[in-house]
Curated annotation (Swiss-Prot):
A GO biological-process term: cytoplasmic translation
Gene3D superfamilies per the UniProt record, alphabetical: 1.10.1200.240, 1.10.1650.10
Organism field: Drosophila melanogaster
Name assigned to this protein: Large ribosomal subunit protein eL19
Gene name for this UniProt entry: RpL19
Positions of the UniProt region annotated as Disordered: 152-175
Length: 203
């Protein structure tokens, strides 16, 4: 029996696959052994004496099934764990994820004019200082701050209105007093004039 090493190599080159994927018909070994050119190999491939084997299926069914189970929390007990908690889920990674969420929210609020740049900077530094443990806490804090700001503004406006009212009342009172004063002065002047005329007439 002759060696078919050359034919196998040429067939692999023509079929563009590995030598392991080439199937040579065992019943036609003599005919295959006589071929020594690519052209003849192509002819044999066309005739079906040389075939490219199909890809061996490497099923991922078990992997998918296991992954699905892990998503539900199976196979993750203490007995399955090898590394430390920090190795399995680094605290730095958790911190980065949290900061990105909080900073994205702050940026969105600043761009939509829900918060001004001063409050943005204040909250940004608070996020960096680990004040807010999640997005909900930050949102609640922002709403609370805005409500406080609105309330203080309303109280300031009310106080200003009250002061304005008092100022106007004082002004009106001063005007009334001044008017009365003028009237009294005019009355006294008139009385003095009448008295002077009466004294002149008596002489």
């Amino acid at each position: 029996m002759s060696s078919l090493k050359l034919q196998k190599r040429l067939a692999a080159s023509v079929l563009r696959c590995g030598k392991k994927k080439v199937w040579l018909d065992p019943n036609e070994i003599n005919e295959i052994a006589n071929t020594n050119s690519r052209q003849n190999i192509r002819k044999l491939i066309k005739d079906g004496l040389i075939i490219k084997k199909p890809v061996v299926v490497h099923s991922r069914y078990r992997v998918r099934k296991n992954t699905e189970a892990r998503r539900k929390g199976r196979h993750c007990g203490f007995g399955k764990r090898k590394g430390t908690a920090n190795a399995r889920m680094p605290t730095k990674l958790l911190w980065m994820q949290r900061q990105r969420v909080l900073r994205r929210l702050l940026k969105k609020y600043r761009d939509s004019k829900k918060i001004d740049r001063h409050l943005y900077h204040d909250l940004y530094m608070k996020c960096k200082g680990n004040v807010f443990k999640n997005k909900r806490v930050l949102m609640e804090y922002i709403h609370k701050k805005k409500a406080e700001k609105q309330r203080s503004k309303m109280l300031a406006d009310q106080a200003e209105a009250r002061r304005q009212k008092v100022r106007e009342a004082r002004k009106r009172r001063e005007e009334r007093i001044a008017t009365k004063k003028q009237e009294l002065i005019a009355l006294h002047a008139k009385e003095d004039e009448i008295a002077a005329k009466a004294a002149t007439a008596g002489h």
